[in-house]
Structure formats: structure tokens, C-alpha cells
Amino acid sequence: MTKIILTDIEGTTSSLSFVKDVLFPYAREHLPEFVRGHRDDTEVKRLLADARAYAGGDLDEEALIERMIGWIDNDQKITPLKALQGLIWEDGYARGDFQGHVYEDAVAHLRQWHQQGLRLAVYSSGSVHAQKLLFGHTAFGDLNPLFEAYFDTRIGGKRDTASYKAIAKELGVEPREVLFLSDLRAELDAAAEAGMKTTALDRAGNGEDFGPHPVARDFAGVGV
């Protein structure tokens, strides 16, 4: 019996284009000024130190900014960078520069499942902070009350089976009691290997090969 629905964000609850065409370019454009303006903030200072350590060199501020922009351009899932992006997006949401995109069908079914007593959680490569910002600033209002837990790369990579086992343990359930939703087969494979149930979201309807995983065009097609 399914007790928890664990959902991805990009390409699943939300448009890939929102992340790639709105959020990433916004963070890239505003990263230099944000770092220069907040370098002495305790959290930013810690994240910059973590990013510098990850880069493996004693980079000065401008070189580090350039390196991080390169990471953004290559869509690298680096934890301190993701956290910095989240802080930049927080400013953007607060200024009303954009709203978090969530598909209407996703909102309707997340609300329905929540009302039915199903527990809901999120697992995305974006930081937990960024996840909460996206769901907190949508055209449908603040959706965060629907979710009980959020997971990012701090628990492990999304293509690693161990990550899904760790999530189930954190949620206090057996993996078989979790239904994972994603648009990427490698993530679905890892979740299934951990023992979770899975459904692939094929919003583009491209007939992508999702192998043994059930496929839905939108949340209305997800069987729980």
C-alpha cells in the first residue's frame, strides 16, 4: 500500500523550461553582484568557502565567481552552488521578478492526495531552500503545507539507489510504501532498485523509453 508520494520537480511537477530558461539564467546574471554584496554574511561566507574547497584551489573571489558561472553553464549539481542559487532566487521571488511554476494538474492531484491522507515529499537536485521557494510562490498560492519533507543532494545523488533507501528510512517507511515520480529513467531505475514503486512523467509525450516503469502524461494518469 502506498503511504507516501515522493516527487521530483523539474519535468514532473514543474516545467523544465521554467528552471532552465528562468531560474538558471537569473542566478547566473545575479551571482556576481550577490556574492560581492553578501560576501560577509555568515551563510554566504560558509557557502563560498565550501565552493572554493570543492574547486580544489585557493581561488580569489573573482576567479571563484567565474568558476561557479561555469558550473551553472554545465548544469553541475554542486551543493554549495545550489544553496547560493537558492539565496539569489529568494531575492527574485521577493521582488516579484517571477513566480514558481507548477502544472495545474500537479496542484490539483497533490491537493487531492493530501486530502486523502497520503503523505507527500519532494526530492530534487535543487536545494531544499530553493524547493520551498518554488512551491511557496506559485500562481496557486503557497503549496508548502502539502509537503511534510524535502530532500536534495545532501542525502545523495538522484541516480544512486542508496539515496532512496535513505529517504525511506528518514520518512519511517519501507521503500515499497513509497511511490516515486520523475521524468528521468535513471532516477526511476535507482528508486525501483531500492524497492520503491515508480511512475514516469512523460509530459512532452515523446514516447521516451522508460523501460518497466508505468508512464503518465500528467498527474491525472498517476495510479496510487
Swiss-Prot record:
Catalytic activity as recorded in UniProt: 5-methylsulfanyl-2,3-dioxopentyl phosphate + H2O = 1,2-dihydroxy-5-(methylsulfanyl)pent-1-en-3-one + phosphate
InterPro entries for the chain: Enolase-ppase_E1, HAD-like_sf, HAD-SF_hydro_IA, HAD_sf
GO MF annotation list: 2,3-diketo-5-methylthiopentyl-1-phosphate enolase activity; 2-hydroxy-3-keto-5-methylthiopentenyl-1-phosphate phosphatase activity; acireductone synthase activity; magnesium ion binding
GO BP, one annotated term: L-methionine salvage from methylthioadenosine
Entry keyword Magnesium: yes
Residues forming coiled coils: none
Protein family: Belongs to the HAD-like hydrolase superfamily. MasA/MtnC family.
Identification of the protein by name: Enolase-phosphatase E1
Organism whose genome encodes this protein: Thioalkalivibrio sulfidiphilus (strain HL-EbGR7)
Taxonomic lineage of the native organism: Bacteria, Pseudomonadati, Pseudomonadota, Gammaproteobacteria, Chromatiales
